[in-house]
Each structure stands twice: as C-alpha cells, then as structure tokens.
C-alpha cells in the first residue's frame, strides 16, 4: 500500500492534550494553577529583557554616538576599471547605458570613482566624478560631463 497524506498519524504517546489550569478548586490544577504561592512568577510573566536583576544587555552596551545626516546624497559607484571592462570599444556612455549593462540600478544617482585603468576614449555623462576619475578619463582622451 502506498503512503498517503491522510494515512499519516502521529506516533502513539507523542501527542497529549493540553492541560486547562485554573478552572475551579475542585479540579487538580485549580486555585494557583501550578504556579505556587506569591512572587513574580505566580503573578505574571517577567518583562522582555529582564535578566533576574542582573544588569540587562541593552543597558550594559554603550549608547550610539554621533550623528546621521538626513540630507546625505547616496551615489551608486562605478569605477573607471569597470567602465573599461564593460565598454571595451569606448564611445559615449550615459547612466542608461550603465543600467543596461547591469553596472548600476535605474533611477539612482551615479558616481564614477578612479580605481582601475582606462585605455580607450570614452565620453561619460553621469551625476558625479572624483578628481582621479576625471584625470584618468581625460588622460585616455575622453571627456567627463556631470549632469
């Protein structure tokens, strides 16, 4: 006989009914419901993060210092070496071309960094360049234009 989903049963003794506690003093677990008498554990659960009086972890760790500028502009970065690898023939390169090649995501600001070498002349038009990237593009006979 093949095993089917509706034939599966839990092993005997592996499942037991839940015990309903605190349902009257006549039953086995009435009144204090197996919690003993008085104390924090008898009344309710301890709060999240409570470590029995030990200084809790969130108070042992130092506070975060510093400042996060909410107006910071995030750029997606492309290195000069990546441009040389993706466009070996050179030519005019825009943000759309970089998106098409999978170098950056669309609808994001793009910045070209100066890591790597460039041998072909490229005319790059993106949002931002580093100084070293501009130098390398110009040295290869290309141009760097910021949007």
Curated annotation (Swiss-Prot):
GO terms for molecular function: rRNA binding; structural constituent of ribosome. HAMAP family: Ribosomal_uL15. InterPro entries: Ribosomal_uL15 (IPR030878), Ribosomal_uL15/eL18 (IPR021131), Ribosomal_uL15/eL18_sf (IPR036227), Ribosomal_uL15_bac-type (IPR005749), Ribosomal_uL15_CS (IPR001196). SUPFAM superfamilies: Ribosomal proteins L15p and L18e. Residues 1-42 are annotated as: Disordered. This is Large ribosomal subunit protein uL15. GO terms for cellular component: cytosolic large ribosomal subunit. It comes from the Bacteria. The keyword Coiled coil does not apply. Pfam families: Ribosomal_L27A (PF00828). GO terms for biological process: translation. Keywords: Ribonucleoprotein, Ribosomal protein, RNA-binding, rRNA-binding. Binds to the 23S rRNA. Part of the 50S ribosomal subunit. Belongs to the universal ribosomal protein uL15 family. The keyword rRNA-binding applies.
């Amino acid at each position: 006989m093949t095993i089917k989903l509706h034939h599966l049963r839990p092993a005997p003794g592996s499942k037991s009914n839940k015990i309903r506690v605190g349902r009257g003093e006549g039953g086995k677990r009435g009144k204090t419901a197996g919690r003993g008498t008085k104390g924090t554990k008898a009344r309710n659960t301890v709060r999240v993060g409570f470590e029995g009086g030990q200084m809790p972890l969130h108070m042992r760790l130092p506070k975060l210092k510093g400042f996060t500028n909410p107006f910071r502009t995030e750029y997606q970065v492309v290195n000069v070496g990546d441009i040389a690898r993706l466009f070996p023939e050179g030519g005019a390169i825009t943000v759309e071309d970089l998106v098409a090649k999978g170098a950056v995501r669309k609808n994001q600001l793009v910045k070209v960094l100066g890591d790597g070498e460039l041998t072909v002349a490229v005319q790059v038009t993106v949002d931002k360049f580093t100084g070293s990237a501009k130098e390398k593009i110009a040295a290869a006979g290309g141009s760097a234009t910021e949007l």
